[in-house]
Amino acid sequence: MAEDGQRTGPGVVAVVALAGAVLLFLIAPVVIIVIVSFSGADYLSFPPPFLSLRWYQRFLGTPSWRQSIVVSAQVALLTMVFATVLGLLASLALVRGRFRGKGAIYAVLLSPMIVPTIITAIGLYFFFVRLKATGSILAMALGHTVLALPVVIIIMAATLQGFDIRLEQAALSLGASRVTALRRITLPLILPGVLSAALFAFLTSFDELLIPLFLSGVEVQTLTVRIWNSLVLEVDPTIAAVSSFLIGVTTVVLGASAFLRGRGESATGT
């Protein structure tokens, strides 16, 4: 036993070291951006010569940046509503339904996760150009829904599969209609999973660049498009502050989603 431990010891150390190196490689850019965002210098520098909030003040004090936050929030909220409703209906059909071609339909619904986003963006651009709808919040929200829907379906399908169907069957046996059982039994119990999926849809939209890059207009720009345009024209530490803001939003949303998923698993007993 001791010899086995000695033989496996170096392997375990190597795996842990490799995992730590990968984790550091992934986290280091984020940490650097956050630190640079507090720099008081007039240019991007790491480590910063001294700390200051001046770039956050410029970010939040510039009307164009604030407008981009509002546009991103509006698009993300619409995307969240569209993707959540469509994803819930699709998940119910895929999990509960018995019909031919269910696997093919499921594959088609998840295809936006496989197809390169640039191809999806180009297709959406030509579609909305024909409708003369580019540059609108609705067009960007519909485009983001295409990307968010697969994520929502995966989360909701997993939630429904973990739901004890006997609870709904008991309600039906007591005279409740399917709609009533769904509304008063199923939905309250899977609500944490639904909210978690909705948050992921919001985050998918809020962080997306390529689709709004094709569909946004001169006056209607999301925060990510505004960052891109600023990087093309000029680079100053304001970009680091904006990026840190996005990192903060992502962290909060992911934390809330993880909390809701934990509550959902407790409620469904999975």
Question: Where do the model's predicted regions map?
Answer:
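Transmembrane alpha-helices
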Residues: 18, 23-30, 146, 153-165, ...
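Transmembrane-helix boundary motif in ABC transporter permease subunits
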Residues: 2-8, 77-109, 126-129, 165, ...
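Membrane-interfacial helix termini and adjacent extracytoplasmic/periplasmic loops
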Residues: 4, 44, 48, 53, ...
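Loop-to-helix entry region at the N-terminal start of transmembrane alpha-helices
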Residues: 67-74, 126-151, 155, 191-193, ...
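Interhelical loop and adjacent transmembrane-helix boundary motif
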Residues: 5-12, 41, 56-67, 206-256, ...
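Short membrane-interfacial helix/loop motifs at transmembrane-helix boundaries
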Residues: 28-63, 213-218, 270
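C-terminal transmembrane helix and the adjacent membrane-cytosol boundary/short C-terminal tail
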Residues: 2-17, 101, 157-168, 172, ...
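Hydrophobic alpha-helical transmembrane segments of multipass integral membrane proteins
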Residues: 66, 70, 74-86, 90, ...
